């Protein structure tokens, strides 16, 4: 599959997206489904397509994405990160534009672990004065 394909791996929260990109008509496939079908929410679709819109390449590439882990928001972010890396692999001249928009940087925020003696990461048990 790698022949004339450019690839990039994107990560966000606990999601990992492997993105394969080649010149084409603008068809985006996520896990074998059309992007509209896979991501139900319009915001998730918009987030995933941001690097293409920024570089005016919405109709220029066919993209195949394999994404797993996490939820819809994390998968959309991982897809955006993967598409960004694949675009840079295709044309390194796009890196400054994508970097300026903040798409090249991996969003390092993760879920904070639950602590012993607390209800969640920071929430303590309810305090009773009497």
From Swiss-Prot:
GO terms for cellular component: cytosolic small ribosomal subunit. GO terms for biological process: translation. This is Small ribosomal subunit protein uS9. The keyword rRNA processing does not apply. Keywords: Ribonucleoprotein, Ribosomal protein. InterPro entries: Ribosomal_Su5_D2-typ_SF (IPR020568), Ribosomal_uS9 (IPR000754), Ribosomal_uS9_bac/plastid (IPR023035), Ribosomal_uS9_CS (IPR020574), Ribsml_uS5_D2-typ_fold_subgr (IPR014721). It holds the Pfam family Ribosomal_S9. Gene3D superfamilies: 3.30.230.10. Belongs to the universal ribosomal protein uS9 family. It comes from the Bacteria.
């Amino acid at each position: 599959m790698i022949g004339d394909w450019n690839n990039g791996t994107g990560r966000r929260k606990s999601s990992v997206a492997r993105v394969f990109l080649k010149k084409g008509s603008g068809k985006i496939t996520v896990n074998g489904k059309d992007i509209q079908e896979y991501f139900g929410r319009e915001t998730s679709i918009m987030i995933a397509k941001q690097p293409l819109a920024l570089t005016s390449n919405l109709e220029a590439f066919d993209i195949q994405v394999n994404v797993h882990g996490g939820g819809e928001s994390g998968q959309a972010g991982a897809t955006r990160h993967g598409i960004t890396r694949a675009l840079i692999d295709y044309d390194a001249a796009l890196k400054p534009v994508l970097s300026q928009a903040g798409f090249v940087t991996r969003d390092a925020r993760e879920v904070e672990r639950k602590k012993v003696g607390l209800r969640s990461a920071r929430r303590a048990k309810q305090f009773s004065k009497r």
